[in-house]
């Protein structure tokens, strides 16, 4: 997986001295799926050797839409950690931490909220889309302001790069504006981040109607068994105009072919040609896709099993990552308070 840097500044991403830092993460509202993998997670795995990588489990932001389902939160936090480790995130190279355990993030969020307009948040396209998806007629304070919290997540770690799906670009743009505003108002102590969008910014779901989503029941999860993958691919939407096996197909409108293009690139051209000529049927095409997906997921299943059998190790990984993240956040907040002249006990007073 590669990806491209979406330069919101209109220029190239400037490398700075020392190891650059990445901040990325997910809300723990359920298991991660193939859309997460190609949209962001594969880039995190690839870049963790090159960058100082921080991965946030955004449990506070999960409450913006799941506040009434908090009994699942702890299970989901550990579940998403398993997804990271199974996908190849190395805790020796990447710092995995829990958002709610870093109080400095919430302090910085409050400072940012003092100069961030409510109208800017209301007109954020991702906020509007998610509000409609969840049926929010009257947005809560926490939901409306979560992009400000995201800006604090990113900037408190001085992240240069943020691997995201394309629907998160408005949030990165807002984070850049907030950081720029802070640096102009006080002192330039924070870093303006860039968005790194995956090779497949938005993967269509199994139903072919919308992007893959855990809430829409159209996802292949990284934690799915081989039998579950087989079943889901058998039921995936294909070319609706193709009735018989020998009918010429239209791969450009077929969800299964889109997955071949993404996950089976080496055979995609052959499959496209065979589909158009009617020499391969949908059943055989789906079997080849399921085989390819299971081949890709099998190493993840092996890593998952290793960590599932040692829950104490998973807890220690989270605790150590959170300790490290807390230390970095404290250092940044010392600079922030100094810049804002609210470090009241760090200098002499004159009455």
What are the residue ranges of the model-derived segments?
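Internal, conserved structured core segments that host functional sites
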Residues: 126-129, 133-178, 182, 204
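N-terminal Rossmann-like or analogous alpha/beta NTP/dinucleotide-binding catalytic cores
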Residues: 16-152, 305
């Amino acid at each position: 997986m590669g990806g491209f840097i979406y330069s919101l500044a209109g220029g190239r991403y400037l490398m700075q001295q020392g190891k650059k830092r990445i901040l990325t993460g997910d809300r723990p509202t359920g298991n991660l799926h193939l859309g997460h993998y190609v949209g962001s997670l594969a880039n995190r795995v690839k870049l963790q050797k090159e960058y100082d990588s921080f991965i946030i489990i955004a449990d506070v932001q999960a409450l913006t839409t799941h506040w009434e389902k908090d009994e699942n939160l702890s299970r989901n936090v550990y579940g998403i950690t398993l997804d990271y480790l199974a996908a190849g995130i190395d805790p020796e190279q990447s710092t995995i931490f829990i958002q709610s355990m870093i109080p400095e993030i919430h302090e910085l969020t409050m400072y940012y909220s003092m100069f961030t307009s409510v109208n800017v948040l209301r007109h954020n396209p991702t906020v509007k889309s998610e509000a409609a998806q969840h049926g929010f007629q009257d947005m809560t304070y926490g939901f409306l302001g979560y992009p400000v919290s995201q800006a604090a997540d990113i900037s408190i770690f001085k992240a240069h790069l943020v691997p995201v799906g394309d629907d998160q670009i408005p949030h990165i743009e807002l984070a850049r504006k907030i950081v720029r505003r802070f640096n102009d108002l006080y002192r330039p102590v924070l870093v303006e981040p860039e968005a790194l969008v995956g090779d497949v910014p938005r993967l269509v779901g199994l139903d072919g109607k919308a992007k893959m989503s855990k809430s829409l029941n159209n996802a292949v999860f990284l934690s799915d068994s081989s039998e579950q993958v087989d079943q889901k691919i058998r039921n995936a939407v294909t070319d609706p105009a193709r009735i018989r096996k020998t009918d010429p197909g239209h791969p450009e409108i077929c969800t299964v072919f889109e997955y071949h293009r993404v996950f089976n690139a080496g055979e995609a051209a052959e499959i496209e040609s065979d589909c158009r000529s009617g020499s391969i049927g949908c059943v055989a095409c789906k079997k080849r896709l399921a085989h390819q997906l299971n081949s890709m997921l099998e190493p993840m299943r092996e890593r998952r099993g290793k960590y599932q059998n040692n829950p104490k190790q998973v807890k220690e990984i989270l605790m150590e990552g959170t300790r490290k993240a807390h230390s970095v956040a404290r250092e940044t907040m010392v600079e922030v308070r100094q810049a804002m002249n609210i470090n009241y006990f760090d200098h002499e007073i004159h009455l």
